[in-house]
């Protein structure tokens, strides 16, 4: 991602004026061993399956893709983002093959069936409804570990 000083003025102004949440003391739980965890990906790369509705500027919703999907597209609005590595190997941003290898080798318990993508750079407050829906879906699927991949 580009430096904020190199962004267009309108983007720089938008990002500079975002209210960031204040976190007091987070609640932590003792995690289970990695070999028992079910892992799902959440990314802000605006990734979706080919044919799904593309993300729009400051989209508040999310897209779902399956652990077996490989025909994925990135519709992130940041023009300064270099997509060349992604175009050669989707594992650069969505490491599904690596996670499946880790599960097969017993390093992690399993890979969730569903994974989630958002449009980065949107106001987090406007995404809360969608984020809660994703959390609900992950809980239903037994996900206890999320691999966060910001773009």
Model-identified regions with their sequence ranges:
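An N-terminal assembly and electron-transfer interface module characteristic of large anaerobic redox
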Residues: 1-151
